[in-house]
């Protein structure tokens, strides 16, 4: 028997006896081949280690970036690399150790709150059609926050936005959001948006907190949960009055499009004109019918009756037209005044800047000579240094 034959037989034996196994261990010596995209690493515990390989097509399905020191669960088959005789695992899937425990906790809490009725539609508060004042509960240094501001300005610049900085990752997430939520709920907002961009299950775990869920349910203000991406679900999503797929989608779900509103007003004007023309046409037809009827019936009584009917119809039509015109005029004046005031506000504030150092917002007086920092406005960011 040759070495090659031995290795091939050993490979066949291992793969037939261990076609699918699940192994828990810590990643070390992780590398990604730049040309093939395959992953190679060692899985170890306190007493032993084994080489592992994961091919690119499989690695693309992993929802996190592996790194040395991570404890993971590998599913795959045991094999031998024939050219060298190295014993290894060909990984078919990888998940973080403890992920199954998190899923169990998530399912248990979801069932508990559902049984208590916290997810029931009857308790969901409707979102306002034309919100004038809303609150963001998010990280003010995040891309999600900037995206929400941009979409809000594009769709409905009349809305006033207050932002509350909260932790969106880590053990302080729930308490931070609860505190901000209770504060915002007392300030007469039309809606409160809890938002965070995408991340791993562990990154988003703070939004699966029972106390946070109960705080959202108890809020008097309508609450939108916009946590992660479309495939991410949190307990906050289920208990909130509305779940948006992403923070950007939350703005599109909540705010009307000003261009659509203007088109609706134009359509209403056309409807009113057509309605008035229709009324006049009906009156004209009625007069023609009356004229024919007068030829065969009492002239005096018919004239009197049609004069009364005509005056009554004229009065109703006049009152209706005045009502509709007054209604449209009031709506147009209101929107015009709001638009002017908000446009002035955005014009005044567009040149305001924020100062951040090492990713955190700081005060100008706290900077020292030699400090590097970033100056950011709504439109641009620049790096600077104190001389």
Curated annotation (Swiss-Prot):
GO terms for biological process: DNA catabolic process. It comes from Campylobacter hominis (strain ATCC BAA-381 / DSM 21671 / CCUG 45161 / LMG 19568 / NCTC 13146 / CH001A). PANTHER family: EXODEOXYRIBONUCLEASE 7 LARGE SUBUNIT (PTHR30008:SF0). Keywords: Cytoplasm, Exonuclease, Hydrolase, Nuclease. It holds the Pfam family Exonuc_VII_L. HAMAP family: Exonuc_7_L. It catalyses: Exonucleolytic cleavage in either 5'- to 3'- or 3'- to 5'-direction to yield nucleoside 5'-phosphates. InterPro entries: Exonuc_VII_L (IPR003753), Exonuc_VII_lsu_C (IPR020579), OB-fold_nuc-bd_dom (IPR025824). One of its GO terms (molecular function) is nucleic acid binding. It is found in: Cytoplasm. Its EC number is 3.1.11.6. One of its GO terms (cellular component) is cytoplasm. Its main location: cytoplasm. Heterooligomer composed of large and small subunits. Belongs to the XseA family. This is Exodeoxyribonuclease 7 large subunit. CDD domains: ExoVII_LU_OBF (cd04489). Bidirectionally degrades single-stranded DNA into large acid-insoluble oligonucleotides, which are then degraded further into small acid-soluble oligonucleotides. It comes from the Bacteria.
